[in-house]
Amino acid sequence: MDGWRRMPRWGLLLLLWGSCTFGLPTDTTTFKRIFLKRMPSIRESLKERGVDMARLGPEWSQPMKRLALGNTTSSVILTNYMDTQYYGEIGIGTPPQTFKVVFDTGSSNVWVPSSKCSRLYTACVYHKLFDASDSSSYKHNGTELTLRYSTGTVSGFLSQDIITVGGITVTQMFGEVTEMPALPFMLAEFDGVVGMGFIEQAIGRVTPIFDNILSQGVLKEDVFSFYYNRDSENAQSLGGQIVLGGSDPQHYEGNFHYINLIKTGVWQIPMKGVSVGSSTLLCEDGCLALVDTGASYISGSTSSIEKLMEALGAKKRLFDYVVKCNEGPTLPDISFHLGGKEYTLTSADYVFQESYSSKKLCTLAIHAMDIPPPTGPTWALGATFIRKFYTEFDRRNNRIGFALAH
């Protein structure tokens, strides 16, 4: 494929070394690493099984929706993880019960399936379940928790226990999910979610896990960073890593360029334009961009993406945009204007051939997604962008930094 990415079919287990320090200071209280693995997304799994996505209804093309806790509605937005490709591992309880989770900057709550989930929910049958009776450190809370997705509702109740993440143990309130829709979660490689957002995004105002880690004073800096391997197409390859308390210079070059957040409470920054080739095509008057580790693709409003796809000559196929594979290498660069710099993706970064599809058509890792106010309308920069640019989330200074990944 002349260097451009082929999407993997395999599911992988995580290797997590909380105290691994290759290339980092030997003080284990300074940095903590979480190693990630790459997996097929739920959407890929559905397509591989021959599921007609059009029959699932239009809600499957809307990856975002408002959330609610009990009778209160939050303006927070959370992905439905249809296209999520990276997961890591945490332990909950004493002794730790291990779960594969998505680390998501677009949300702030932690949740995993509960042993109290009825076997009538097929998704629970296919996932690891937290059993409070097996944990000596468990504390009951019981507050009802409901996460409303565009593809269904995940609900349960809050509990408290010790969570181990990256070698750090922290007492954390989390959701035990007792109701999960079969689709999409039955096909998910991950069990649950660890939100890396702010308390303003947290359903029920539950203190996010990173805030609780910071309160222990075990990290050198109030930051965490994400690296997604651009060459993780085989089972032996590291999918990526998260560094708590800093960044890993082994995986980026040069210095970070920082952009201040629009406001405290959401990982969202201003954007000054989107260029195709040498011409600014979109966002000429300025717009917003979420930096979302829970999403695989880059997304923008339907009107923006339709204009972008017209410029690229791409055609819509159900919920994707495709081009002829032999045309992929000739597609122009796409640049995102952030903080006075242009962050450029070549066609090798945003065009891929799906392993289950015809070799004649290739998919663009760019989707339309209409996010309502107050967070939207906004672009979202997911793994397609983060694979190219190592990303640091700076809580102390309310900013996001980018450096060229390698």
From Swiss-Prot:
It is found in: Secreted; Membrane. Glycans are attached at N71, N141. Residues 24-66 form a propeptide. It catalyses: Cleavage of Leu-|-Xaa bond in angiotensinogen to generate angiotensin I. GO terms for cellular component: extracellular space; membrane. Interaction with ATP6AP2 results in a 5-fold increased efficiency in angiotensinogen processing. It is an enzyme of class 3 (hydrolase). InterPro entries: Aspartic_peptidase_A1, Aspartic_peptidase_AS, Aspartic_peptidase_N, PEPTIDASE_A1, Peptidase_aspartic_dom_sf, Renin-like_dom. Its EC number is 3.4.23.15. The active site is at D104, D292. It comes from the Eukaryota. Residues 86-403 form the Peptidase A1 domain. The keyword DNA-binding does not apply. Residues 1-23 form the signal peptide. PROSITE patterns: ASP_PROTEASE (PS00141), PEPTIDASE_A1 (PS51767). Keywords: Aspartyl protease, Cleavage on pair of basic residues, Disulfide bond, Glycoprotein, Hydrolase, Membrane, Protease, Secreted, Signal, Zymogen. Belongs to the peptidase A1 family. Renin is a highly specific endopeptidase, whose only known function is to generate angiotensin I from angiotensinogen in the plasma, initiating a cascade of reactions that produce an elevation of blood pressure and increased sodium retention by the kidney. This is Renin. It comes from Macaca mulatta. The gene is REN.
